[in-house]
Amino acid sequence: MATYLIGDVHGCYDELIALLHKVEFTPGKDTLWLTGDLVARGPGSLDVLRYVKSLGDSVRLVLGNHDLHLLAVFAGISRNKPKDRLTPLLEAPDADELLNWLRRQPLLQIDEEKKLVMAHAGITPQWDLQTAKECARDVEAVLSSDSYPFFLDAMYGDMPNNWSPELRGLGRLRFITNAFTRMRFCFPNGQLDMYSKESPEEAPAPLKPWFAIPGPVAEEYNIAFGHWASLEGKGTPEGIYALDTGCCWGGTLTCLRWEDKQYFVQPSNRHKDLSEGEAVAS
């Protein structure tokens, strides 16, 4: 029985299946953890969702910002952008079934035995684990309810960007969503910066990657996350695992086998078109 953690798939179905074959993943015996952003940019979002859903209890995933955006498009709140390549999924006969399943997935995964926590963007240093659990449940409850379109309509925005237990209503839900799915940099006090996307070396002072600011969760748990492809899986402290290595941008899809901490990679089927900054099929 092995536990495999894989970074952002982004619709790269062929690479996902090739990587799972490489590690000899066996549903029913092994467990697959996915860092979110299952969909968008790659050509196979529909196949990815169908496959992941079919795994049942053999998969543990978290929602990413692109997954939430897909739900907003499905609900008629956001525009379907051609570059996201979501039309085959949105027009599929089982779209309702797939997307209603997707919106009932969590923002946070925890394995107490492994001392392992996973969230798409990471865990803000302003939270302890109990707060993270409560915050995840708040958003998950709304997403799984009939009123989820109202939340999706209000989730876009960068404020508030500082945690307080006194936050209420949509502002609270927006902060939680941003912390779990969009966070990269923080100010030294843990306040979120929602604008900088460059590498840590190029970020303006006093910003730091969230994982460079001491927080109570990282003191006791390993943290696995995706979202930040430009890290290329590097530069994190011990016990912090960056797994998004930019498959949809022409990089690789990365898998970490938890038991022996061995990495496996599957090269993207796409290459970078530097003139456009987009990855194209090779």
From Swiss-Prot:
It comes from the Bacteria. The keyword Iron does not apply. One of its GO terms (molecular function) is bis(5'-nucleosyl)-tetraphosphatase (symmetrical) activity. SUPFAM superfamilies: Metallo-dependent phosphatases. It catalyses: P(1),P(4)-bis(5'-adenosyl) tetraphosphate + H2O = 2 ADP + 2 H(+). Keywords: Hydrolase. It is an enzyme of class 3 (hydrolase). Its EC number is 3.6.1.41. Coiled coil: none annotated. It holds the Pfam family Metallophos. PANTHER family: CYTOCHROME C5 (PTHR40942:SF4), PTHR40942. Hydrolyzes diadenosine 5',5'''-P1,P4-tetraphosphate to yield ADP. Belongs to the Ap4A hydrolase family. This is Bis(5'-nucleosyl)-tetraphosphatase, symmetrical. It comes from Escherichia coli O81 (strain ED1a). The lineage of its organism: Bacteria, Pseudomonadati, Pseudomonadota, Gammaproteobacteria, Enterobacterales.
